[in-house]
Every structure is written in C-alpha cells, then in structure tokens.
C-alpha cells in the first residue's frame, strides 16, 4: 500500500516519513525522577508495526521502556496517516488499540500493571475497510464500543472509506458489529473519529472534501446520522477534532488546508439531535500554516493545535460559550521538530507531549494556563520509527 500523505498547503505535499527497520529493545539507564505514568506512540512501521513505550517521570522527562518497541501483529503504512487518534487507550486503562494502516487491521495490546504492552492473542482483526487511521472508544456496559475511521484506499483516490463499529470484550477481543459500517463517498479521506464524553455522539472529519460527519449513537451501538449531516467544516481540510472536556455539546475542529498563515479552528455547538451550528465568529484564525491536531485543557479553558508545516503550536483561550481568542504561538525548533502532529496532555494537565511525524521525536512542555515551556531533555527520539502516528499519555 502506498503511504498516505498530508497536504501541508505550502505549494505541495509533505510526506511524514518513509518505512524504516525495526530496532531491538534498548537497555535503559536508571533515572533519578520517579515513574508516574507512561507515553505510547504508534510507530506505524511498514514491515511489522510496533508501539513505542516510554516511562513518564515526575519531572516530565521520558525514558524508553526496557522492552520497547512492542509488535502489534499488523503492518503500518510507513508514512504519515494524516489523522488524529491512530492510537487509543480504553477508558479503564487496560488496553491499547492501534491502527495498522498498511495491513487494514486494528490491534489490541493489554497493558500490564507496570505499563508494558502485550499482544492479545487474536487481538489483531480486520478493520473492515481500507487504511484505518483513527479509533474512538467509549465505555459500553461491561465492554467498550469502538469505532474506526477507514480513510479509503490512497492508491485509488481514497475509495471505499467508512466508519465501522466493534465491541471490545473484557478479554481484549474485538467483535465486528453487524450493519455498523457507514460508507462515505469516494475521495472523502477520513481523518478522525471521536466520541463525546457521554458516548452518545460521534463525529468524524472528511479531510479532502471539508465536511464534518455527526452521528447519534443508538443503544445497539449503531450510528444514526444527525439531521443535516455532513456539515461544512467552515475551513478547508478538517483533520483533528475534540469535544470540550467540560461541555460535551461543544466541538472544535482544526482546518489544515487553508494555505500559508491561513489556518483556522472551527467551533460548533452540538444539539441534542446531533446537529452542528457554528459558535460565535468562527472559524477562528490561527495565523499559522496547517493546524492539524487539537488538544483541550482538562478544565476546558485552553485549546492547543499543532501547525505541522511551520512548525509551531498555537494557543487559544476558550470562553464559556465556546468562542475563542488566539493567545499566540509557540515556535518549535525545525531541526528537531520538523512536523508536529498528535498531542496529548498528562492526566494532571501540567505536561503536554507532542509526537513529531517528520523527525520521529516526542517533545514535552510544561503547561501553565495557556503558556507552554519546553522541558529540559526534550525532544526524545522514538526508536525504530520514522513516521509515528498517534500518542497516548497516562
């Protein structure tokens, strides 16, 4: 399968990485700061996909886990997935779910008490589509409800894209839900699929046609299109999306393809029936190029977006009604941070971790309100990957 590409809107296309060889697990030296959590990255390697695992220390620094990287059982694409959510953790923290975009599969890995991922026997299954790029998970009774966005075949104009549902049981096995597949027109190029915090709504982005899908989730786990869906994204190239943690009825979408210094973030109000309406004077200017991925502070007051083509991170404050004010942008070092993509906050919200698809690194920042301060020792290299996609922080 040919690599997916991410339009950087700078007169062409930027491909975030080529396939590289896997590397053996490395010995890890003792670290003075105690381990308080972990960071995982989907390495997206073509010849046998792996997950990179890092110990996260109290000072925010990262060290590779002794056994990292960990095989998923499928194959990555070897290049950027142009998506948000290529790696996810279940709400109870027991499993990681990864897209294997090169083999059209999803893999499940069980997390040990010490944070080490282990492949689940029978845990690699068909995604029921071509080029899975994004995963959404919500609690569903004793199990979890999972939806995957299949971008479509990149060698054939992103044909065959769809959203498909699964039930993840307590043993870590994915079961396809009959009649759950929702097809999208050829050429849509899905970039994200996302549940709201209550698990009652699902949204997805169509990058190539600048549309946002909105669905209501039935008791049977099936998706039902909201009235008027899909909706105009209000900007070209919607890619990343995030519901406000403090308000599941507010949705924010990054528009990546507006051109140089013309990126935007859209803000939507989500009604009870799933319909989307614009908030305030949206879309809100980014004044940067290719804002692709979105993260919102746990208190819902600030939004961060990575500008992949610059590279930089834009910072917004969010008003109670969902309108936004651009605070500024944090410039990144283009020699070590060539293409920032997915980003996630630590559980306490005091650290922000950004995976770089161009340099195969992870950057780390201290967060104080809407201010970002780079942490000493970052970025760190993602061993064995030249095209990482997706990040989990726990």
Q: Which sequence ranges carry the predicted segments?
A:
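Blade-level signature of beta-propeller repeat domains, shared across WD40, Kelch, NHL, RCC1
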Residues: 357-394
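Beta-rich, blade/repeat-based domains predominating
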Residues: 34, 72-92, 127-143, 154, ...
């Amino acid at each position: 399968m040919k690599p997916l590409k991410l339009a950087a809107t700078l007169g062409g296309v930027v491909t975030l990485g080529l396939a590289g060889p896997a590397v053996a697990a490395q010995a890890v030296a003792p670290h003075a700061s105690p381990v308080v959590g972990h960071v995982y990255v989907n390495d997206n390697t073509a010849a046998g996909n792996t997950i990179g695992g890092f110990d996260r220390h109290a000072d925010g620094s990262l060290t590779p886990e002794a056994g990292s990287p960990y095989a998923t059982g499928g194959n990555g694409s070897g290049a950027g997935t142009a998506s948000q959510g290529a790696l996810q953790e279940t709400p109870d923290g027991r499993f990681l779910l990864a897209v294997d975009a090169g083999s059209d599969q999803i893999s499940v890995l069980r997390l040990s008490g010490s944070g080490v991922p282990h492949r689940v026997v029978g845990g690699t299954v068909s995604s029921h589509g071509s080029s899975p790029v994004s995963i959404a998970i919500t609690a569903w009774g004793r199990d979890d409800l999972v939806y995957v966005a299949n971008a479509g075949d990149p060698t054939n104009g992103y044909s065959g894209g769809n959203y498909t549902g699964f039930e993840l049981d307590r043993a870590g096995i994915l079961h396809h839900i009959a009649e759950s597949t929702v097809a999208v027109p050829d050429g849509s190029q899905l970039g994200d699929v996302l549940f709201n915090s209550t698990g009652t709504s699902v949204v997805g982005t169509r990058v190539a046609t600048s549309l946002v899908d909105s669905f209501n989730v039935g008791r049977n786990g099936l998706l039902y299109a909201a009235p008027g869906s899909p909706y105009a994204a209000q900007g070209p190239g919607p890619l990343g999306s995030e519901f406000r943690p403090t308000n599941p009825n507010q949705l924010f979408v990054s528009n990546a393809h507006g051109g140089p210094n013309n990126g935007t973030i859209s803000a939507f109000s989500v009604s009870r029936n799933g319909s989307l309406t614009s908030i305030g004077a949206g879309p809100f200017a980014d004044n940067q190029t290719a804002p692709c991925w979105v993260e919102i502070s746990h208190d819902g007051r600030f939004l961060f977006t990575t500008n992949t083509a610059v590279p930089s991170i834009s910072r917004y404050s969010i008003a109670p009604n969902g309108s936004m004010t651009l605070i500024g942008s944090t410039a990144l070092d283009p020699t070590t941070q060539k293409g920032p993509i997915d980003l996630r906050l630590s559980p306490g919200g005091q650290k922000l971790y950004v995976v770089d698809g161009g340099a195969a690194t992870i950057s780390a920042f201290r967060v104080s309100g809407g201010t970002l301060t780079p942490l000493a020792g970052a970025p760190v290299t993602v061993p064995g990957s030249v095209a990482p996609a997706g990040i989990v922080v726990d």
